Design a protein with these regions (language model features):
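The feature captures the beta-strand-to-loop junction immediately N-terminal to the Walker
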Residues: 34-36
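Helix-to-loop junction immediately C-terminal to a conserved catalytic motif
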Residues: 49
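Conserved ABC transporter NBD signature motif
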Residues: 57-69
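Hydrophobic anchor residue at the start of the ABC signature
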Residues: 76, 140
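Short helical segment in ABC ATPase nucleotide-binding domains corresponding to the A-loop/adjacent helical element
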Residues: 89-97, 107, 111, 215
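Conserved signature/switch motifs of ABC ATPase nucleotide-binding domains
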Residues: 125-128, 146
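Catalytic Walker B motif of ABC-type/P-loop ATPase nucleotide-binding domains
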Residues: 151-154
């Protein structure tokens, strides 16, 4: 699904969050949105999800104005938002049941998806019985089982330790490569953006405007990001973070 923003403004009362944002994102691209807290990055996700309407301008999906929420556009939060009274398998199956899939088929498919994210054997566990990383793996399975055309990720790994975060980044890359949704990723982790994204948009403080766009499609990536040192320094500079020790 292609996404397009045309001169988008968003206000909350007198608070101007987004001003004149333009952008076009192709099917299958992963675009990372990086910027200061509160600058409007998450609001852009909410506009695509259909949870908010722009104050001015248009947000289009495949050339059509977004009328409201749809399972074609799935939002994943930092907090996994699993139902605590349901097992992991039931949580994943719920995404299909809400689309009218019968329970038996939904549970069968959810078992397969839990295996895809290395949670086979944990189908009958409840969210409080597993680690944060396992809960977020479940959230990814629930997001992908419905085969969304757009995946909206709001700091999905921000609450996890470094090793778990890296492992889940790899899981996410594999799933995206296989299913090719268009992905918007909000993150404060510059290394995560460098590793995952095809393009990185660096935003100013509120109201959000794009300071610079980085194209990251020019080579294969690994968790060794040393070849992206120049891009990393430039992104941090744009964010106002000092990277060199003064003398």
């Amino acid at each position: 699904m292609q996404l397009r923003f045309e001169e988008v403004d968003k206000h909350f009362g007198q608070l101007e969050v987004i001003k004149g944002f333009n952008g076009e994102f192709a099917q299958g691209e992963l675009v990372a949105l990086v910027g200061p807290s509160g600058c409007g990055k998450s609001t852009l996700l909410h506009l695509v999800a259909g949870l908010e309407n722009p104050t001015a301008g248009r947000v289009l999906a495949d050339g059509e104005k977004i009328p409201g929420p749809s399972p074609r556009r799935t939002l994943v939060f930092q907090e996994h938002a699993l139902y605590p009274w349901l097992s992991l398998q039931a949580n994943v199956a719920m995404a299909l049941e809400l689309q009218g899939v019968d329970k038996a088929s939904a549970f069968e498919q959810s078992k397969v998806w839990l295996e895809r994210v290395s949670l086979d054997g944990f189908e009958h566990y409840y969210p409080h019985q597993v680690s944060g990383g396992m809960r977020q793996r479940t959230a990814l399975a629930r997001a992908f089982i419905a085969k969304p055309e757009v995946l909206l990720l709001d700091e999905p790994f921000g609450a996890l330790d470094a090793l778990t975060r890296m492992a889940l980044q790899d899981v996410l890359r594999e799933l995206i490569a296989e299913h090719q949704p268009t992905v918007l990723l909000v993150t404060h982790d510059v290394d995560e953006a460098l590793y995952l994204a095809d393009h990185i948009l660096v935003f100013s403080a509120r109201p959000a405007r794009v300071l610079k766009t980085f194209n990251m499609t020019h080579c294969e990536k690994s968790h060794d990001l040393s070849e992206f040192a120049a891009e990393r320094r430039e992104i941090l500079r744009l964010l106002g973070i000092k990277t060199e020790v003064g003398h």
